[in-house]
Amino acid sequence: MSGQRVDVKVVMLGKEYVGKTSLVERYVHDRFLVGPYQNTIGAAFVAKVMSVGDRTVTLGIWDTAGSERYEAMSRIYYRGAKAAIVCYDLTDSSSFERAKFWVKELRSLEEGCQIYLCGTKSDLLEEDRRRRRVDFHDVQDYADNIKAQLFETSSKTGQSVDELFQKVAEDYVSVAAFQVMTEDKGVDLGQKPNPYFYSCCHH
């Protein structure tokens, strides 16, 4: 794979108002939009080119609608996704329950999709810790259980946003290289652990 271009389909999932679009805006355009909230209808697509070692990686990011009325439509966009960033609002416990729904959906329909749990709006906790409604340790236990990775982010300050997307790209490149290596050796991938599946936390 040395020097090759790599394309990765990434889907953003989560309840409306959790800040999926803000997360993408911060990562792709390095900006935080302040103004009236606008619902994403269907999905918005944006691409970001980056480097991982000697490889050029293009993240094709699908920002899906969070409203339940667009739920069926969202399924169209995560078909074939290699990574899913499932977002929840750290100040809204119901958004974490909704995130669990999307994880179940992905596990049943896209088994090969690596999941990243993303707690949003961490800047609000810096202002007032009492606003936290989703316990960090509970989410970490859940992440460990589903073999996902956990990040707590802020689109306003940029906290852990670049790190999240960089990890998505690095993990995919590692898995792709692993698959090429094992295929070259004639190894049955079904007997090998997927190196995607480990958990870590970033504050």
From Swiss-Prot:
The modification Phosphotyrosine is found at residues 17, 172. One of its GO terms (molecular function) is GTP binding. GTP binds at residues 19-21, 40, 66, 121, 123, 156. It is found in: Cytoplasm, Cytosol; Membrane; Cytoplasmic vesicle, Autophagosome membrane; Cytoplasm, Perinuclear region. GO terms for cellular component: autophagosome; autophagosome membrane; cytosol; endocytic vesicle; endomembrane system; endosome; mitochondrion; perinuclear region of cytoplasm. Induction: By extensive retinoic acid treatment, in Ntera-2 teratoma cell line induced to differentiate into postmitotic neurons (NTN2) (at protein level). It is a lipid-anchor. Residues 63-80 are annotated as: Switch II. PANTHER family: PTHR47978. Switch I, switch II and the interswitch regions are characteristic of Rab GTPases and mediate the interactions with Rab downstream effectors. The switch regions undergo conformational changes upon nucleotide binding which drive interaction with specific sets of effector proteins, with most effectors only binding to GTP-bound Rab. The unusual Ser-67, instead of a conserved Gln in other family members, is the cause of low GTPase activity. As a result, the predominant nucleotide associated with the protein is GTP. This is Ras-related protein Rab-24. It comes from Homo sapiens (Human).
